[in-house]
């Protein structure tokens, strides 16, 4: 069996889903009293009169085959009662009775009837007359297909079923099918391991689904069973449960999620067919986004955001491959689409492709969510905080609480852009109170004094400030302009250590050292470097400064700091009157 055929056993077809949603009526067996009397001799007559005659058995087989074909034709026309009459005539031949029982069970399922007794009868036939039915591979294959028909796989629909559709699913029907699994578990106990594993895993999955539909917490024992049964189906449902918990509660058990993602990655690597199933790959890429977003092991935030955007784009493209209205209703479609746009805004990189230029998003340009996201994107470009607030309020119906962190970062970045690109180049002096008013709306987007001072200081530290400034914290003013770009002077060094005026004068001539601590020239921060490249850059800078110091026999930073550390608290107190604030 190919990988595609093998995985097909795990996916629910439309026919399976429709039969799953049918109501269960009753377990009354059909009335056989009106069976049509056939003029030919019945199988029982053959069995009683022909004995061991080979010709008689061949005739029985041929007659039963004819009855089976007739019943199958009636079943294909949805004439289930008539079909059942013909199938019931095939008792005399074990192989044709086995086939007939399968068709009767399928007919009962189509009519919403219980199949408990028919199942027991079929498995009793298999246990007593297995050799007369056929090879084990044929029997086990038939049983496997029948199991998937009676208790279809619900796994792929756990995350991809809208809440309204979930509420329409009859939980009692699901519980009835779970009871079939109890019968199947006993019946396949003596069969091959594949069938036993299939029934065991299916029981766990149905148990999870029942708790999900009831909005109940999944028992710890059930989750442990999922982890213990290493299987594509169990890992896929675990992946979906992690995603669902994150979306609903903003909770991620990162260590467990990383393990499940790694296992799913191995399944996809080892099976080309599995790696091409969009329902699987879309959840996988979204889960990889979660591991990146929630991980704290990031030295380069831009690199992390770029990877997040890539995973969400892959997720959205896989969802688009599902196609049709089903895709439009998927929960992940909305979240991945918003995540792509949000990550793009946070990257703040004009060289990257605008998300709305993607073909998969272009086809949805009339969608309400896409229209809102385009408005949000334009407000962000215009640095219009009031319009941005209105867009975010309209988006509240679409996103889950976990997006709040992203949105807070987007608002902060928009405020920073407006400060340095609109306000600072325009004003030479502005009161802090007026500046705060320009960076807030008074409703959901706020800016207090501490936040503003933090923004100003961080902008200098991160080299995102486009204009030099000076703070007057006595009068609460901020001054912008190139004139506030001044080097450190020797008398200002005296403020730090009044006893080291001579040493300060020596150091002030060492502009290499001043450049290294960002006091003389404009701060220079290496952009888009990995952690290793950044450390190499810093090492090279230190070597250059050390060699220059040795060549001129001038004091180094280390010697200055060592001397500075010998100042006593009393010495500093005596000279406290000379302390003043710097730019």
From Swiss-Prot:
Main localization of the protein described in the UniProt heading: cytoplasm
Keyword Ubl conjugation carried by entry: no
Taxon lineage: Eukaryota, Fungi, Dikarya, Ascomycota, Saccharomycotina
Record function comment: Component of the COP9 signalosome (CSN) complex that acts as an regulator of the ubiquitin (Ubl) conjugation pathway by mediating the deneddylation of the cullin subunit of SCF-type E3 ubiquitin-protein ligase complexes. The CSN complex is involved in the regulation of the mating pheromone response.
PROSITE patterns assigned to the protein according to its UniProt record, in alphabetical order: PCI (PS50250)
Segments of skewed composition (Acidic residues): 1-35
Keyword annotations: Cytoplasm, Nucleus, Signalosome
Residues in PCI domain copies: 297-485
Cell compartments where the protein resides: Cytoplasm; Nucleus
Subunit note: Component of a COP9 signalosome-like (CSN) complex.
Organism: Kluyveromyces lactis (strain ATCC 8585 / CBS 2359 / DSM 70799 / NBRC 1267 / NRRL Y-1140 / WM37) (Yeast)
Start and end residues of each stretch annotated as Disordered: 1-55
The name this protein goes by in its record: COP9 signalosome complex subunit 10
One CC-aspect GO term: COP9 signalosome
């Amino acid at each position: 069996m190919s990988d595609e055929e093998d995985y097909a056993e795990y996916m629910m077809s439309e026919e399976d889903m429709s039969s799953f949603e049918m109501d269960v009526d009753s377990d009354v067996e059909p009335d056989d009293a009106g069976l049509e009397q056939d003029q030919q001799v019945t199988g029982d007559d053959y069995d009683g009169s022909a004995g061991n005659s080979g010709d008689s058995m061949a005739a029985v087989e041929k007659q039963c085959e004819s009855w089976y074909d007739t019943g199958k034709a009636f079943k294909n026309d949805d004439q289930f009662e008539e079909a059942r009459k013909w199938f019931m005539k095939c008792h005399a031949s074990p192989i044709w009775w086995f086939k007939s029982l399968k068709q009767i069970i399928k007919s009962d399922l189509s009519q919403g009837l219980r199949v408990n007794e028919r199942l027991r009868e079929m498995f009793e036939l298999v246990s007593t007359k297995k050799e007369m039915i056929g090879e084990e591979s044929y029997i086990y294959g038939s049983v496997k297909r029948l199991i998937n028909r009676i208790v279809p796989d619900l796994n792929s629909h756990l995350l991809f079923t809208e809440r309204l559709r979930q509420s329409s699913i009859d939980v009692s029907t699901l519980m009835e099918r779970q009871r079939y699994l109890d019968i199947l578990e006993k019946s396949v106990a003596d069969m091959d391991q594949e069938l036993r594993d299939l029934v065991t895993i299916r029981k766990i999955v149905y148990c999870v689904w029942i708790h999900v539909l009831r909005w109940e917490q999944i028992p710890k024992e059930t989750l442990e069973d999922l982890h213990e049964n290493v299987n594509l189906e169990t890992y896929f449902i675990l992946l979906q449960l992690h995603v669902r918990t994150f979306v609903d509660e903003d909770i991620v058990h990162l260590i467990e999620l990383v393990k499940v993602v790694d296992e799913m990655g191995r399944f996809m690597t080892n099976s080309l067919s599995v790696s091409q199933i969009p329902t699987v790959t879309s959840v996988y890429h979204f889960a990889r986004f979660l591991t990146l977003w929630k991980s704290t092991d990031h030295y380069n935030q831009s690199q992390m955001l770029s990877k997040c955007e890539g995973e969400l784009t892959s997720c959205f493209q896989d969802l688009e491959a599902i196609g049709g209205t089903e895709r439009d209703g998927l929960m992940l479609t909305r979240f991945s689409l918003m995540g792509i746009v949000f990550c793009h805004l946070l990257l703040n990189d004009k060289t990257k492709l605008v998300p709305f230029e993607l073909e998969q998003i272009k086809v949805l340009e009339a969608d309400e969510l896409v229209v809102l996201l385009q408005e949000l994107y334009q407000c962000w470009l215009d640095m219009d905080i009031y319009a941005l607030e209105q867009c975010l309020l309209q988006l509240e119906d679409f996103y889950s609480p976990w997006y709040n962190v992203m949105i807070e970062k987007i608002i902060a970045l928009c405020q920073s852009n407006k400060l340095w690109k609109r306000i600072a180049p325009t004003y030479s002096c502005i009161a802090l109170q007026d500046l705060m008013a320009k960076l807030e709306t008074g409703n959901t987007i706020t800016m207090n004094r501490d936040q503003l001072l933090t923004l100003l200081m961080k902008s200098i530290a991160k080299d995102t400030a486009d204009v030099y400034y000076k703070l007057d914290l006595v009068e609460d003013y901020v001054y912008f302009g190139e004139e506030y770009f001044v080097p450190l002077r020797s008398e200002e060094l005296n403020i730090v250590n009044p006893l080291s005026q001579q040493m300060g004068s020596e150091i002030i001539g060492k502009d290499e050292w001043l450049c290294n601590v960002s006091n003389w020239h404009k701060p220079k921060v290496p952009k888009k470097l990995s952690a290793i490249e950044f450390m190499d850059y810093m090492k090279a800078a230190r070597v250059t400064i050390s060699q220059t110091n040795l060549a001129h026999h001038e004091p180094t930073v280390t010697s200055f700091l060592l001397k500075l550390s010998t100042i006593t608290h009393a010495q500093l107190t005596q000279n406290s009157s000379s302390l003043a604030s710097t730019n």
